Amino acid sequence: MRKFSRTGNLPIRRLAGLDAIDEAVGRITEMGRPAAFVQGVGVMDAQTFAAFEILKYTAEQVAKHDARMIVCNPLPEIQPISEEIVRGAYIKVGREDSYNPDDVRYLADTSLRAAVLGIFQREKVAATFLFGNYYHESVIFAEAGNVVGALQISGTANTHQLPFFVACCDYTLIGEEIFAAGAYLSRNPAQVGSLVAQEAAKFFAVAIILIGAIMVTANNKSLVDLLKK
């Protein structure tokens, strides 16, 4: 974290799904149809904050191209945050007059599924961005996007929903990639430092497992005995 704060540089690979966002924005601009950004379903967790960073980047790209994006929020507490993120994106690129607050919508949990499907159908969205905490809604929204021919980019850390996103979407951030994407886009020292530390811990754990397996195969149990202490 200190190194990133000092140098502003830590090696984080840019994910293919992030490049696809630029492709999707170009698509909605050429087709003259809006995009839809759905921030998961009714639970606010770490995935929600990662989705905020992706929303910020996407909104800036949409604003630059003077295109339109409808943001669907499942929780009242994230509605004002989303409004400020999208409004800030338009201000940043000098298009504040193009910002439409009606395109950032709170959809109550009881009506969320029907409301999102209605938006997809009525607006004939050309691209969908499905990021955040998803359950069975993943297949509902992704299939609805397929019906209208949208280019779809998704991401969730809920591994039990990933098969539906992978099957239905053009690009998917798999598992913890959504957190990596959020850290990559935000360049926040705390997020980047946490991400790098987690990855380093994973490499260390894998190395210990491999070394231990080799040593046990060679009938050397010194590492096993050490870890038991």
Locate predicted features.
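Hydrophobic alpha-helical transmembrane segments of small proteolipidic membrane proteins, enriched
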Residues: M1-L15, M215-K221
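Gly-rich Lys/Arg/Thr-decorated short loops/hinges at beta-loop-alpha junctions or inter-strand turns
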Residues: M1-N9, E96-Y99, Q161-P163
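Histidine-anchored nucleotide/phosphate-binding helix
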Residues: A24-V25, F49-D66
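Long, charge-dense
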Residues: Q61-A63, A67-R113
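Short, well-structured alpha-helical segments in soluble
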Residues: A115-E123
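Extracytoplasmic/lumenal ectodomains and periplasmic regions of secretory and membrane proteins
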Residues: A127-E176
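C-terminal functional extensions of proteins
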Residues: V166-K229
